[in-house]
């Protein structure tokens, strides 16, 4: 599906003059208020090779990502690590900085990419499941076609991906720069407004895509906030290289970023998590009467989703006038989740997730929280740590220390409460009430 147009000459930019966000990488270390990491080989989220056949293991080690001479350095290395032949890093601002519309500028130096390195500077939407969340690729290098014609170190690509009638849709262009890109820094700019996305390198526009008034496509993916990603992959479908021996690019290879700057455009919105930190104390997730410093309001900033095999049942609440009470049939998994906008809950580190739960089921279930690191779960196995739960059909307070959740990023919480179970052997009735976060 092709819904955009590409231009060879730079048209007038809608660049505003108001700088609303920047990272100049001048600190002693990568700013954790802005950046977090994807770690692993993708298998942990069901996307081995990150869905692209990549051969690196992403880490958060300084060997792979650090500040050096006022620049962000992402370094790919040939080394055996966690069963993979290479290491590198992928940084993202998910849950920390998102924006909709604006002029985004980055000064980047790519490594020698031929053959096998794949530096990328891109964005993902904050809502939905790919491709329905939308993807904007501002710069990718090391593509197979450029390797084939000898322009790997001069050619870049830009693209957008979205959902079109339930299928993946794409639009992409490529541009061959007059000089090798690895010898110096180059300025990559995107202008994004309600009508169009444009991209340029060193003032030369090479991509334009209309995102309004397109027959048969809402393109809603490009009218919501996105977050940034920076990574240096090794191998994969984009490069056409799928064996370690095929990687001939010099290693270690470094992608360096001098700065990122966002200027405000008409209709723009910006979210910076550190400016919206939830106050310490108690934060109400699903509670009517608990004294809280802040709380979710369902239908406004939160939604309860019944994912599968849950039917409401009559049950008196533990408190107030509302309760989550459901029946799950035998033989089918069941689950629910409370979703909200990203929330910075850092003040609750060292605290606990508290709730009241009532059930008699002997089967295993798990309670979780979703953050920028993915899903984090605590299992409730008969005979194991029940965190206060007694399966006797009476209300009991359950208190789970946040430290019990593996790999939890409280600075970017998306699903504040989840409960999931594998198919039970017999029907289950379960009731949940008075759910809140308690700080230390």
Language-model region placement:
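Residue-level signal for beta-strand positions within conserved beta-sheet cores that form or flank
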Residues: 12, 132, 226, 363, ...
């Amino acid at each position: 599906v092709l819904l955009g147009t590409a231009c060879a000459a730079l048209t007038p930019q809608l660049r505003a003059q108001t700088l609303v966000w920047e990272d100049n990488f001048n600190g002693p270390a990568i700013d954790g208020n802005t950046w977090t990491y994807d770690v692993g080989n993708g298998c942990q989220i069901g996307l081995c090779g990150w869905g692209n056949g990549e051969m690196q293991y992403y880490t958060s080690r300084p060997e792979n990502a650090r500040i050096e001479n006022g620049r962000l350095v992402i370094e790919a290395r040939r080394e055996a690590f966690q069963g993979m032949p290479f290491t590198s890093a992928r940084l993202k601002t998910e849950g920390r900085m998102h924006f909709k519309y604006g002029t985004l500028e980055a000064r980047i130096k790519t490594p020698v990419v031929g053959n096998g390195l794949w530096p990328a500077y891109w964005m993902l939407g904050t809502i939905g499941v790919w491709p329905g969340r939308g993807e904007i690729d501002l710069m990718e290098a090391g593509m197979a076609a450029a390797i084939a014609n000898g322009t790997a170190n001069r050619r870049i690509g830009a693209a957008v991906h979205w959902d079109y009638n339930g299928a993946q849709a794409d639009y992409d262009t490529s541009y061959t720069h007059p000089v090798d890109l690895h010898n110096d820094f180059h300025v990559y700019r995107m202008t994004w407004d309600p009508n169009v996305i444009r991209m340029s390198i060193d003032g030369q526009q090479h991509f334009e895509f209309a995102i309004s008034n397109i027959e048969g496509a809402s393109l809603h993916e490009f009218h919501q906030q996105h977050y940034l990603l920076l990574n240096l992959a090794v191998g994969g479908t984009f490069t056409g290289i799928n064996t370690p021996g095929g990687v001939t690019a010099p290693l270690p290879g470094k992608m360096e970023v001098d700065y990122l700057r966002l200027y405000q455009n008409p209709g723009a919105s910006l979210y910076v998590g550190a400016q919206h930190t939830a106050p310490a104390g108690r934060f109400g997730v699903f509670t009517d009467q608990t004294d809280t410093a802040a709380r979710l309001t369902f239908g406004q900033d939160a939604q309860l989703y019944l994912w599968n095999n849950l039917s409401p049942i009559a049950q008196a609440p533990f408190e107030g006038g509302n309760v989550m009470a459901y029946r799950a049939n035998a033989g089918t998994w069941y689950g629910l989740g409370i979703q909200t906008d990203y929330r910075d809950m850092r003040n609750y580190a060292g605290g606990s997730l508290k709730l009241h739960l009532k059930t008699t089921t002997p089967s295993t279930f798990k309670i979780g929280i979703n953050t920028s690191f993915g899903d984090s779960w605590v299992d409730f196995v008969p005979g194991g740590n029940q965190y206060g739960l007694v399966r006797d059909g009476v209300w009991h307070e359950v208190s789970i220390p946040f430290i019990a959740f593996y790999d939890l990023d409280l600075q970017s919480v998306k699903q504040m409460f989840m409960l999931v179970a594998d198919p039970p052997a017999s029907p289950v009735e379960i009731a949940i009430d008075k759910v809140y976060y308690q700080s230390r």
